[in-house]
Amino acid sequence: MGTPAHPDLASVLLSRAEDGIPISHAVAVHERRSSFDLFAAYNTAVWPALVVLWIASAVVSVLLLSSRRPPDRWISTLLAAHWIWSAVAYHAVFFTRINPAAWLFAALFVVQAALFFWAGVVQGRLSFTLRRNAWAVVAWLLVAYSLLYPGINAVQHLTWSRIPTFGVPCPTTIFTAGLLMLARGASWRLSIVPVIWTVIGGSAAFLLGVRADYALPIAGMSLVIFTLQKSSARGVREAHETPRIRVRP
């Protein structure tokens, strides 16, 4: 199903200008309508897959909180699936209809999926643990928020068919940020694309008025601070573990 037809942007701007409405406002309204039409087409076409992805993510999250922790490779596989799904099903198939830059976004998301698959599934370097510290609280708040994301948007927009739901880039990024804060063995490279998307998606959230995405900058800043703090602690630890050579006079 394609997106519903609307007047092109030039026609909209001309009409709004004749009505005395600022062009910047007209552009924002047009972009918002086009985006929500896109969400409607996306949700209608792939909703069964979105339900499966949400259930899988919720089950893994609950198991991670319980004593029956799922295998780390399963969690890494789920994260890789999130990113490749957003790359292909959302960016490449749908978002490119209204934004050519979506091809670049799709490429970034494919890279992130490949990183998770390589580090977590092939090499098995990622270990997701139930920590008990301040960062764990932040991590679980982000995970919970991402799972509640469809409901938060539904409260604001009221129409399920036209809202951003699970299985789109923004909740994927928030969910990923939370799990990365619970992961041992995660390289800082795994945080690059998620942080980039918190900037891109966060700016779009304010333009389109998607309030559920206002959490993106918080997720991004939290992940940056967490990653820098972890890298600093690792550097200090390695410095203390390096054998010192004493030179006797």
Question: Residue locations for each model-derived region?
Answer:
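Membrane-interface capping segments at transmembrane-helix boundaries
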Residues: 121-125, 228-243
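Loop-to-transmembrane alpha-helix initiation sites
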Residues: 100-105, 207-221
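Membrane-interfacial loop-to-transmembrane alpha-helix junctions, especially the N-terminal start
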Residues: 70-80, 131-138, 184-194
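Aromatic-anchored segments of alpha-helical transmembrane domains
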Residues: 81-89, 141-152, 195-207
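Membrane-proximal helix-loop-helix units in multi-pass membrane proteins
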Residues: 101-177
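Hydrophobic cores of alpha-helical transmembrane segments in multi-pass inner/ER membrane proteins
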Residues: 51-62, 107-122, 169-182, 216-231
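Short juxtamembrane and helix-loop transition motifs at transmembrane-helix boundaries
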Residues: 13-16, 32-43, 63-71, 93-100, ...
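N-terminal topogenic module of multi-pass integral membrane proteins
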Residues: 2-96
